C-alpha cells in the first residue's frame, strides 16, 4: 500500500526516478518559488508565482527539501549521518540479504546531498562513509520530529484539488493529464477541478528536473507538479498525482524489510538514498498491508547499475513466486483503499462518469439501514449537463427533511448550491445541473425506515450557457466521442462583450468537406446566424471571436469512425484597445483574444514597462535602395538592442538584401544575437532566415514589396555586427504570373518562365506541355518530386529516376511529403523503388496512400524509382530527398572497382563525425586486394583523430592490419581470406581531402600484409 503521510509530516517534496531520456539539470535555487508559464490553452501565456519542486535548498538523492522543510526537519551540522550504522541480523529468506538503511539515522555509502550553487550548476557534497573523516566536506544531519499533532492543512480540504495546466503542453498531453485525474476521481472521493479563485492549487508545468511533485497540499499558494521530458505518460502522471494526494513511495514504509530486499551493490552510485526507509512515526499506512501492486512502488531495476540487475527484490509468497512490482497502468486496490481512508470517503456511494447510469439507497427496495451515509459524485464531460430523475422515493418524512434525506447539489462538493433536499414518498421533479457535475448525498438517522430511493441520470450535451467563462468538450472527451451524437451550445456573455473561443485540442474524423463528423460555429444565437466555419481533421482551428455577445456551436458525429474530439475554452472578450487610455499604451495597442499588448511605431521600441516607447535603431524606409548597419558599425554593437527596419517598395516590386559584412555572436542555433529577415512588415510574416556567427548570408529577395529586418543582441558578448545593402526591382511575375502558365521566376531587370516536374517549356517561352520524365541523377544529394508538384499529379503518367552515387556509398531516399491514391495492394497509382539501376533489380517496396514511407537505403550505389498513375483519381504526389550513406557490403571481382572516403570526394573535404564501415567480400578461393590512389587524412602521431583502419575479416574482431592517417601513398593491402573490412573515422574538427582506393579479387592470398 502506498504510504499515506501522517498529517503531521506532509512536508517533503519527492523527486521521482526519471524515465529513459528524461533530462536532469542542477539548476537549484535558494528560493523554492519560480515564475512559470500559465494559460487556459496553448499559446497565450501569463506569469504565475508558484512553489517550484525543482528548486530546493538541499537535495537528499531524489528527495528535495525547501527552507520550510529544513526548519521542520531540523537539518543541522553533521551528527547522525557520520555515526557508524548498527547492523541488525537479516531475515532468512533463502535469497539475497542486507540490513536496510534507516532514514535518517544511517546512510548508504557514497550518498550525497546536493546544495545550490550561485552559478546554477550541481554542487554535490559527498557524505563520508561510517568510520572515515572528511574535514573539507560540509555535511548535514536530519533529525525528524515525530508526528505528535495533526496538520490538517496538508490534506486537501474536502478532497478537492484545484488545478491549472501550463501553457506549454499540447492538446494530447492535456488529455493525458485529465485522463489521469479522472482515474483518481473514478476510484476515490478525491475531486480535481479547474482553478477559479482558490489560493492553493497545483500547476502542471514542464520543469527541467523531469517528473516530480510535492507530497500533499503545500499551502500558501500554487505548487507545481513537474511533467518534464518523457514524463507525459498516463502511468507516470497518475503516479505524480499520487504524491499530490498525499502518498510516499511504497518501498520506504517502515515494514518494507518484511516484504522486499534492497540489493545495495546494484544501486547506481549516489542514488542509495532513494532506498532508505522511514520511521514508523513519520508516515502512516493507515492499517493497510504492504502493496506490491501499488502504482507508487518502485520497479525491480529502478536506479540500477544495469537494466537486468535488481535493486528491489520482492520476497517470495507462499507459492514461491516473487510478486511483480513497479506497474504504471492503474491504481491498485490497495491504493484505492488507502486513499479512501486518508480522505475519509463515505463507505457508501461512488463516482459516476458514464453518460448514463443509476444508483439507489443501500438495501433498496428492502429498506435502508439506520445511520447510513452515502455520496455519489456524478461527473460528465465539461459542456454537458446532467438530467437526474428519481423513479422511486420512500424515505422517513420529517419537517425540513431533518432526519432521513437525499440532497442534490449543483457542483462537485457539499458546499455547491443546493438543488433540493427530499424525503417522504413524493417523487421529485427532474433536476438539471448548470454544469457537468452533481453531488448527491444520502443520510439516515431515524429508526423508522423506508424502502429508500432509486435514481437514473443522463448526460445531455449542448444547451444554453450564460456565464463569463467556461469550457465545452465533445462528449466523452478525452476518450473517443460516441457515434451519432449532435450537441448544440448557445453561449451568451454579458452585453458589451464578445465571445472568445480558443481550442486546447482538436481531433475529429477528417474529410475534405467535413461531411461526416464536424464542428460548426456561427456568429450569433441560432443556426441561421452567419457561418464562421465548418471544422474537422487534426489541426486546431484558429481562435474565434464573435461580433456580439453570442456564439452558436454545434458538434455532429456519424455512426462510424470516432476520434478523441475537441476541448475548447470560451470567455467574455473585450477590446482593451478601445478604452479611452488604449490599455495604457503610449503609441499603439494591439488587441489579442483574451488580452492585449502594446507596440511602438517604427524607430521606437518598448521600454521596460512594456507600455511606453523609446527611440530605437531601425526605422521605416521607402527608398528603392540604401544601406543598413548594426548600431555602432563598424565598432562593436551594444548589448540589449532590438532594431527593426521596415523597408517598403512600390507595388509589384521585390526587395533584395545583400550582406557585405557579417559578424555576430552565436552559431547555428542563433539564440543569443541574431538578424531575422522576413517578407512583410509584421513579426510573424514569412521568415527567410535567422542568421548569426561569421558566415555571410546569401542574397535574400522578398516575396512582396515589403521586407522586415530585425537585429537583436543579448546582454553579454558583442561583435562587429553587419553592413547590408538593399535594392528594389520590379517583379514582372507579380502581375498575372508574368504570363507564365506554371512558374514565373523573377530576375533582376527581367523574368523567365519555368515548368514543373514532368513538363517542358513551349517554344513561346510561356506555356508548358507534358514531357517525358525519365531522369538520371548523379549528384550526392537533391530533391525528387512527383510530376506537377505541389499540385496534383496528372493521370496516365509514368516517371523514372535512376540515381547513382559515388562508388562505395549507398543511395538513401527520405520522404518529406507523400499522398498517392490509396489501395490495399497499391494496384492503381504507386511508387516503386528498386535496389539497382533499373526495374529488373530487386524491389525494395511499392508505396501508396497518405502514410510517409520510412527512409529507404539501397545496398549499393544505385537506386531506381518508378512512379505510375492510372486514368482516374489524382492526389498531391510526393516530395523526397535523396542523399548518401557511407559503408555497406561490397563485392570484389576480377574487374577493378572504386572506393571513395566520402560521396563528395574531389569537390569537398570529408565531413566531420563520419563513421563508415565497408566489408569487401570476394568469391571463395579468392582474396581482396586494395590499392590506394589518393590518401590525405588529418595526421596525428597515434592516428587518434581521423583515421582509416583495415581488418583481415568481416568485422573489427578480425586481426587488424593497421590504422592509417597523414598524407602520401599507402602500400597495397591484401586479405588472407575472402574478406576485408575498411573503417573510416573522423572527429569534429580538421577535415582533409580523404582517400580514393581501388579493389579487386585476387588469388594471391599469401601476399605480405602491409605493416602499420
Swiss-Prot record:
**What residues does the annotated propeptide cover?**
22-146
List, separated by semicolons, the cofactors it needs. Answer: Zn(2+)
The entry's cellular-component GO terms read:
extracellular region
Q: Name one GO biological process term.
A: proteolysis
Give one Pfam hit by family name: Astacin
Q: What is its EC number?
A: 3.4.24.-
Q: Which Gene3D superfamilies match?
A: Collagenase (Catalytic Domain) (3.40.390.10), Laminin (2.10.25.10), Spermadhesin, CUB domain (2.60.120.290)
Report domain EGF-like positions: 573-614, 729-769
Any single GO molecular-function term of the entry would be: metalloendopeptidase activity
Q: Could you name the active-site residues? A: 240
Q: Where is this region: Disordered?
A: 83-135
Comment on bound cofactor = Binds 1 zinc ion per subunit.
Residues at which Zn(2+) binds = 239, 243, 249
Task: Provide the leader sequence positions.
Answer: 1-21
PTM annotation (Omega-N-methylarginine): residues: 960, 963
- Give yes or no: UniProt keyword Oxidoreductase: no
Ranges where the Peptidase M12A domain occurs: 146-346
**Keywords in UniProt for this one?**
Calcium, Cleavage on pair of basic residues, Developmental protein, Differentiation, Disulfide bond, EGF-like domain, Glycoprotein, Hydrolase, Metal-binding, Metalloprotease, Methylation, Protease, Repeat, Secreted, Signal, Zinc, Zymogen
Q: CUB domain: which residues?
A: 348-460, 461-573, 617-729, 773-885, 886-1002
Q: Where is the composition biased (Polar residues)?
A: 126-135
Task: Give me the glycosylation sites of this protein.
Answer: 168, 358, 389, 625, 802
Name of the protein: Tolloid-like protein 2
Q: Which organism is it from?
A: Mus musculus
Amino acid at each position: 500500500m502506498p504510504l499515506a503521510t501522517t498529517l503531521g509530516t506532509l512536508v517533503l517534496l519527492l523527486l521521482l526516478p526519471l524515465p529513459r531520456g528524461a533530462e536532469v539539470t542542477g539548476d537549484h535555487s535558494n528560493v523554492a518559488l519560480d515564475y512559470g508559464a500559465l494559460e487556459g490553452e496553448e499559446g497565450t501565456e501569463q506569469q504565475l508565482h508558484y512553489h517550484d519542486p525543482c528548486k530546493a535548498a538541499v537535495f537528499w538523492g531524489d528527495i528535495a527539501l525547501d527552507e520550510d522543510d529544513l526548519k521542520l526537519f531540523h537539518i543541522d551540522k553533521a551528527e547522525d549521518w557520520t555515526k557508524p550504522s548498527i547492523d541488525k541480523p537479516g531475515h532468512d529468506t533463502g535469497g539475497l540479504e542486507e540490513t536496510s538503511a534507516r532514514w535518517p539515522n544511517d546512510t548508504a555509502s557514497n550518498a550525497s546531498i546536493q546544495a545550490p550553487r550561485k552559478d546554477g550548476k550541481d554542487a554535490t557534497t559527498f557524505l563520508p562513509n561510517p568510520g572515515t573523516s572528511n574535514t573539507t566536506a560540509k555535511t548535514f544531519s536530519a533529525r525528524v520530529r515525530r508526528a505528535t499533532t495533526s496538520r490538517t492543512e496538508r490534506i486537501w480540504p474536502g478532497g478537492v484539488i484545484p488545478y491549472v495546466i501550463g501553457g506549454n503542453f499540447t492538446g494530447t498531453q492535456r488529455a493525458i493529464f485529465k485522463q489521469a485525474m479522472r482515474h483518481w476521481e473514478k476510484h476515490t472521493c478525491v475531486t480535481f477541478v479547474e482553478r477559479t479563485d482558490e489560493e492553493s492549487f497545483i500547476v502542471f508545468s514542464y520543469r527541467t528536473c523531469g517528473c516530480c511533485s510535492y507530497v500533499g497540499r503545500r499551502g500558501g499558494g500554487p505548487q507545481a507538479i513537474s511533467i518534464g521530458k518523457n514524463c507525459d505518460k498516463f502511468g507516470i502522471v497518475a503516479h505524480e498525482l499520487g504524491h499530490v494526494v498525499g502518498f510516499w513511495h511504497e518501498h520506504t514504509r517502515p515494514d518494507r524489510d518484511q516484504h522486499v530486499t534492497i540489493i545495495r551493490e546494484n544501486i547506481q552510485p549516489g542514488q542509495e538514498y532513494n532506498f532508505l526507509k522511514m520511521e514508523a512515526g513519520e508516515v502512516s499506512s493507515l492499517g493497510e498491508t504492504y502493496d506490491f501492486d501499488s502504482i507508487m512502488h518502485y520497479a525491480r531495476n529502478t536506479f540500477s547499475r544495469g537494466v537486468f540487475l535488481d535493486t528491489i527484490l520482492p520476497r517470495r509468497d507462499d507459492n514461491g513466486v516473487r510478486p511483480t512490482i513497479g506497474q504504471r497502468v492503474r491504481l491498485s486496490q490497495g491504493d484505492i483503499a488507502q486513499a479512501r481512508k486518508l480522505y475519509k470517503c463515505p463507505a457508501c456511494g461512488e463516482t459516476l462518469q458514464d453518460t448514463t447510469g443509476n444508483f439507489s439507497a443501500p438495501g433498496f427496495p428492502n429498506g435502508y439501514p439506520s445511520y447510513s451515509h452515502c455520496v455519489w459524485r456524478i461527473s460528465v464531460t465539461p459542456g454537458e449537463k446532467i438530467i437526474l430523475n428519481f423513479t422511486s422515493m420512500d424515505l422517513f418524512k420529517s419537517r425540513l427533511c431533518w432526519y432521513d434525506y437525499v440532497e442534490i447539489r449543483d457542483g462537485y462538493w457539499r458546499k455547491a448550491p443546493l438543488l433540493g433536499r427530499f424525503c417522504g414518498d413524493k417523487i421529485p421533479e427532474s433536476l438539471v445541473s448548470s454544469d457537468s457535475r452533481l453531488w448527491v448525498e444520502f443520510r439516515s438517522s431515524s429508526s423508522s425506515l423506508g424502502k429508500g430511493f432509486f435514481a437514473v441520470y443522463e448526460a445531455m450535451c449542448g444547451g444554453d450557457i450564460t456565464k463569463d467563462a467556461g469550457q465545452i468538450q465533445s462528449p466523452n472527451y478525452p476518450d473517443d466521442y460516441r457515434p451519432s451524437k449532435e450537441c448544440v451550445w448557445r453561449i451568451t456573455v454579458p452585453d458589451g462583450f464578445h465571445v472568445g473561443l480558443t481550442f486546447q485540442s482538436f481531433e475529429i474524423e477528417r474529410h475534405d468537406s467535413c461531411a461526416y463528423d464536424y464542428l460548426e460555429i456561427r456568429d450569433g444565437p441560432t443556426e441561421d446566424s452567419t457561418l464562421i466555419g465548418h471544422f474537422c481533421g487534426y489541426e486546431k482551428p484558429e481562435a474565434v471571436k464573435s461580433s456580439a455577445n453570442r456564439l452558436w456551436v454545434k458538434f455532429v458525429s456519424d455512426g462510424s469512425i470516432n476520434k478523441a474530439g475537441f476541448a475548447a475554452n470560451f470567455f467574455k472578450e473585450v477590446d482593451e484597445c478601445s478604452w479611452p487610455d488604449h490599455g495604457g499604451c503610449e503609441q499603439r495597442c494591439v488587441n489579442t483574444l483574451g488580452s492585449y499588448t502594446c507596440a511602438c511605431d517604427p524607430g521606437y521600441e518598448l521600454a521596460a514597462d512594456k507600455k511606453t516607447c523609446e527611440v530605437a535603431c531601425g526605422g521605416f524606409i521607402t527608398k528603392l535602395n540604401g544601406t543598413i548597419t548594426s548600431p555602432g558599425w563598424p565598432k562593436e554593437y551594444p548589448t540589449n538592442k532590438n532594431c527593426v527596419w521596415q523597408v517598403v517598395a512600390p507595388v509589384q516590386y521585390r526587395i533584395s538584401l545583400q550582406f557585405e559584412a557579417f559578424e555576430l555572436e552565436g552559431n547555428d542555433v542563433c539564440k543569443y544575437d541574431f538578424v531575422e529577415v522576413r517578407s512583410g512588415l509584421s513579426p510573424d510574416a514569412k521568415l527567410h532566415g535567422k542568421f548569426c556567427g561569421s558566415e555571410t548570408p546569401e542574397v535574400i529577395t522578398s516575396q512582396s514589396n515589403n521586407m522586415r529586418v530585425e537585429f537583436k543582441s543579448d546582454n553579454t558578448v558583442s561583435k562587429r555586427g553587419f553592413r547590408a545593402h538593399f535594392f528594389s526591382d520590379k517583379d514582372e511575375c507579380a502581375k498575372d504570373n508574368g504570363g507564365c502558365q506554371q512558374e514565373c521566376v523573377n530576375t533582376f531587370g527581367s523574368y523567365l518562365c519555368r515548368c514543373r516536374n514532368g513538363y517542358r517549356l513551349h517554344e513561346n517561352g510561356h506555356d508548358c506541355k507534358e514531357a517525358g520524365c525519365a531522369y538520371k541523377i548523379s549528384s550526392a544529394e537533391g530533391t525528387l518530386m512527383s510530376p506537377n508538384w505541389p499540385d496534383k499529379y496528372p493521370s496516365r503518367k509514368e516517371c523514372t529516376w535512376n540515381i547513382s552515387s559515388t562508388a562505395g556509398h549507398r543511395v538513401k531516399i527520405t520522404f518529406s511529403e507523400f499522398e498517392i491514391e490509396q489501395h490495399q495492394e497499391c494496384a492503381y497509382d504507386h511508387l516503386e523503388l528498386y535496389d539497382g539501376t533499373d526495374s529488373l533489380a530487386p524491389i525494395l517496396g511499392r508505396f501508396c496512400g497518405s502514410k510517409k514511407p520510412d527512409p529507404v537505403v539501397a545496398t549499393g550505389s544505385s537506386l531506381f524509382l518508378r512512379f505510375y498513375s492510372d486514368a482516374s483519381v489524382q492526389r498531391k504526389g510526393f516530395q523526397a530527398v535523396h542523399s548518401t550513406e557511407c559503408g555497406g557490403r561490397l563485392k570484389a571481382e576480377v574487374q577493378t572497382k572504386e572506393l571513395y572516403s566520402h560521396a563528395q570526394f574531389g569537390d569537398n573535404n570529408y565531413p566531420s563525425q563520419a563513421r563508415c564501415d565497408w566489408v569487401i567480400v570476394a568469391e571463395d578461393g579468392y582474396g581482396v586486394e586494395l590499392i590506394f590512389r589518393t590518401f590525405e587524412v588529418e595526421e596525428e602521431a597515434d592516428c587518434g583523430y581521423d583515421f582509416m583502419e583495415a581488418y583481415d575479416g568481416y568485422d573489427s574482431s578480425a586481426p587488424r592490419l593497421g590504422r592509417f592517417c597523414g598524407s602520401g601513398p599507402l602500400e597495397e593491402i591484401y586479405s588472407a581470406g575472402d574478406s576485408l573490412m575498411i573503417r573510416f573515422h573522423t572527429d569534429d574538427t580538421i577535415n582533409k581531402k580523404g582517400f580514393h582506393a581501388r579493389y579487386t579479387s585476387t588469388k594471391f592470398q599469401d601476399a605480405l600484409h602491409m605493416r602499420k
